[in-house]
């Protein structure tokens, strides 16, 4: 059975990590990881906690637009918690570096539903060093959500032969290929490289417009 936890502040994170630690002691890491447990928000996490959660396969269901709206040295987080603590919230890079699976969402109606807003916010984090790459953000906004929902067939959330035909068609402008190494990035516009181009989503770039939405082969919009 999969359990989900609404976890925001440092006290809540500490309680949940301690509970998982006891579960791991009783049942072992493999049994805990197999369940695909998740935490919603998990905004305040330390490096030690992130390492444990990554080792245990605990998914982080997070909302990047929280940082876009309230992060930074002069945002709501800093005003209420101080710059030191406020700048350490929503550290997606820390979570990813420790192997914590990420799933991006909006927490609507708290923030808007547009998934590209979340992708842009995660790749342009207001705290230096807390961002993830565009490709990692895209994966968290697509496959990550399915994984958090318990779907682990390896194809759902991708555009590959045999995957469910669930996708959206977007109007986009400039595209970039985001890859781990520059040498790959220079030649990998070929679809066979399996590194397709993604929209350019800097802070001043226009957001995308959805033209069509398809769910399991049925057109539901456009």
Name each model-derived stretch:
Residues 7, 97, 101, 108-222:
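Active-site microenvironment of metallo-dependent hydrolases
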Residues 1-89, 103:
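Active-site core of metal-dependent hydrolases
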Residues 14, 18, 37, 51, ...:
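Feature representing long, continuous alpha-helical segments
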């Amino acid at each position: 059975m999969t359990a989900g936890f609404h976890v925001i502040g440092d006290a809540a994170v500490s309680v949940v990590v301690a509970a998982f630690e006891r579960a791991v002691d009783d049942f072992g890491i493999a049994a805990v990881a197999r369940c695909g447990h998740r935490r919603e928000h998990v905004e305040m996490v330390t490096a030690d906690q992130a390492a444990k959660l990554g080792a245990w396969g605990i998914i982080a269901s997070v909302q990047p637009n929280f940082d876009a709206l309230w992060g930074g040295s002069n945002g709501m987080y800093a005003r209420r918690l101080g710059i030191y603590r406020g700048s350490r919230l929503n550290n997606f890079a820390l979570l990813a570096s420790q192997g914590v699976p990420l799933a991006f969402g909006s927490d609507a109606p708290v923030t808007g539903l547009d998934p590209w807003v979340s992708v842009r916010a995660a790749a342009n984090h207001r705290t230096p060093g807390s961002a993830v790459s565009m490709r990692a953000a895209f994966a968290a906004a697509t496959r990550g959500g399915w994984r958090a929902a318990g779907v682990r067939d390896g194809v759902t959330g991708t555009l590959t032969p045999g995957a469910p035909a669930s996708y959206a068609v977007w109007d986009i402008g400039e595209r970039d290929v985001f890859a781990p190494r520059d040498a790959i990035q220079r030649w990998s516009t070929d679809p066979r490289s399996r590194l397709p181009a993604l929209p350019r989503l800097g802070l001043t770039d226009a957001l995308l417009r959805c033209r069509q939405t398809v769910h399991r082969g049925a057109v539901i919009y456009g």
